[in-house]
Amino acid sequence: MRTRKTVLGLSALAFTAASLVTTGPASAEQQPGTSEVPTFEQFERSTAKDPQGQYIVNGDMPIKGKAALRDFYEAMTGPQTQLVVNTVYGNDDVWSPDQARQLTYCVSDAFGADKQLIVDSMASGAGLWEQAASGIDFVYQPEQDGSCTTANDNVVFSVEPVQNANYIARAFFPSSDKPERNVLVDVEQLQGAGNWTPTNVLAHELGHTLGFRHEHTRPEAGTCFEDNSWRPLTPYDSASIMHYPQCNGTSSDLSMTQADREGVASIYG
């Protein structure tokens, strides 16, 4: 896989152990060779924002508002406990069975000439999860594409373009409020992502929309720790579609593994 400044974020966050990133914001973790972590103010100043003004952490995870960013910072810098599905207040952050079978979305006409690439990649990326769990159905509603924003209440989420982002794509979790439920895609970076196909990149992002965290937040990865708000579903899988390759991952193309399939099936049937 060729070296590039922007990594799947699928992100330009600077993990100190990652050779794929040359610049980026400070991490809230202790830096090698030091006894200090950055202050919240330092962390806040160095955290990127997306066009909607949301902070982007852990590569492709949006956080709305300074108070929520502070909660995230404190969770990362506080004591690690044994608490990979996202959790909110100790509960799995997943869709209800009925909603999981009706995950409607639109693809914005603003993608222009690149729209068909996104439509096709969303369909094939969604298909990877749907084939693994009978309780999941992503439903494309093209009639909503002309008004495809988070304000459209006719769909669960929107897929919209972004330019000059510090990530290839970013998504949301089931617990996100409706104004935050969109998948943003930088098409130029998506098309230049090397071994990471558009299908696999968008499947990774759709994994987040189903409630799945980055696999490398687990201690077995040895780097790129994010926080403790998760529950393991399967044994650690360094080749997971949810594992950044630059965080001691063993997959070069973000393909889905059997452990990924078993994990999603354990939640969505």
Please annotate each region the language model reported.
Residues 105, 129, 204-207, 242, ...:
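Divalent metal-coordination and catalytic microenvironments
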Residues 116-235:
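Metzincin-family zinc-dependent endopeptidase catalytic domain
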